[in-house]
Amino acid sequence: IEKGETKILPLVLDLTNPSSSLGWASQERLSLLERGPADTILALALIHHLAIANNVPLDRIAHFLKSLCHSLIIEFVPKSDSQVQRLLSTRTDVFPDYTRETFETEFQKHFFIERVIKIRSTERYLYLMRGQKT
């Protein structure tokens, strides 16, 4: 790595509607899927937005994230969390499968869970996962 250079690429995008390839012959700016897979993705405060706010099932989230990276650091935010309660305050809770147990079951189809840390003073958990060979 050149001095002062990092290999960190922060991306801000709507994962439920990612941009396609752009530019001449669709080759100047590659789509998110074409850029990867990344070594590691850091996904904090994300899962509840995809699952609760955007109705994306946990199995689809796990499959998609596996297509983007080799390893994953992801935070699970339970329904009891104030931010999830805020998302649910304007709608009926139709998410019986949004549980930590289901999260682990679905993600273990694509990743090995290497470490789980409970975040102090919260009900949130941080997971380190490594992708399974497919």
Each model region followed by its residue ranges:
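Conserved beta-strand signature within the Rossmann-like core of class I S-adenosyl-L-methionine
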Residues: 61-83
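Structural signature of nuclease core domains in nucleic-acid processing machines
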Residues: 12, 17, 61-64, 110-113
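A conserved beta-strand element that flanks and buttresses the S-adenosyl-L-methionine
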Residues: 41-42
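Flexible glycine/acidic-rich beta-alpha junction loops that bind and position SAM and/or redox cofactors
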Residues: 19, 77-90
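A short, conserved alpha-helix within the catalytic core of class I
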Residues: 20-26, 49-65
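Core SAM-dependent methyltransferase catalytic element
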Residues: 28-30, 115-134
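S-adenosyl-L-methionine
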Residues: 1-36
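Short alpha-helix
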Residues: 93-111
